[in-house]
């Protein structure tokens, strides 16, 4: 997968394929912009392919719904990949502003340096979390959260989920707690 927005869209594609247990999926770090800046070859015609049947199990270990998050507040590490202004409720983007209780704000842009994932050492210093922690990432619609999911996986975290509904769901459900 690749895109032109520092891996935000591509990361969601990779995560989604992992959810469907696709055996071989990856993301072009730096995206199409880096590829073309390096003057690498580009095709302009549609790729021809033969359809096939992929019958793999769904990997439910990497997805979360609001129920799991709500039941585990205070027991899991919740990472909000949105901007600080979204996290603080200044930019609400839902019926309510703020964030999920106990969430840590690590803006997904901090995963990147000049459009590429930071090296493992820099990412590890950003995510100073127990490697065995149960982690859920979220944002507004699970795109930025998927980028953070991949960053965490890149540096060896095993128990990471993306909350698919993210703030778009949580912030609009008036029965869910908000800080």
Report each predicted region and the residues it spans.
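Helix-loop module immediately N-terminal to the HCX5R catalytic loop
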Residues: 104-135
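Anionic group-transfer/hydrolysis microenvironments
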Residues: 5, 82, 109
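Short coil/turn segments at beta-strand junctions that form active-site/ligand-binding loops
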Residues: 74-79, 131-134, 158
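Cysteine-dependent PTP/DSP-like catalytic domain, specifically the C-terminal lobe
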Residues: 161-179
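A short, small-residue-rich loop immediately preceding and capping a beta-strand
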Residues: 1-2, 134-137
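Active-site neighborhoods of enzymes that stabilize oxyanions during catalysis
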Residues: 32-101, 175-179
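Short, charged, surface-exposed secondary-structure boundary motifs
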Residues: 35-38, 113-117, 170-173
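Thiolate-centered catalytic microenvironments shared by cysteine-dependent enzyme domains
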Residues: 1-68, 143-160, 166
């Amino acid at each position: 997968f690749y895109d032109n927005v520092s891996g935000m869209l591509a990361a969601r594609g990779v995560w989604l394929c992992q959810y469907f247990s696709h055996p071989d999926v990856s993301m072009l770090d730096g995206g199409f912009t880096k590829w073309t800046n390096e003057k690498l070859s580009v095709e302009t015609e549609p790729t021809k392919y033969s359809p096939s049947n992929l019958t793999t199990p769904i990997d439910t270990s990497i997805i979360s719904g609001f129920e799991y998050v709500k039941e585990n507040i205070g027991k899991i590490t919740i990472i909000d990949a949105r901007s600080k202004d979204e996290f603080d409720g200044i930019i609400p983007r839902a019926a309510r502003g703020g964030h999920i209780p106990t969430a840590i704000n690590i803006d997904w842009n901090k995963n990147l340096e000049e459009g590429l994932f930071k090296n493992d050492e820099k990412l590890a210093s950003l995510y100073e979390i127990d490697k065995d922690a149960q982690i859920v990432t979220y944002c507004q619609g699970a795109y930025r959260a998927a980028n953070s999911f991949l960053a965490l996986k890149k540096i060896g975290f095993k128990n990471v989920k993306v909350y698919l509904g993210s703030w778009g769901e949580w912030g609009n459900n008036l029965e869910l707690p908000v800080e």
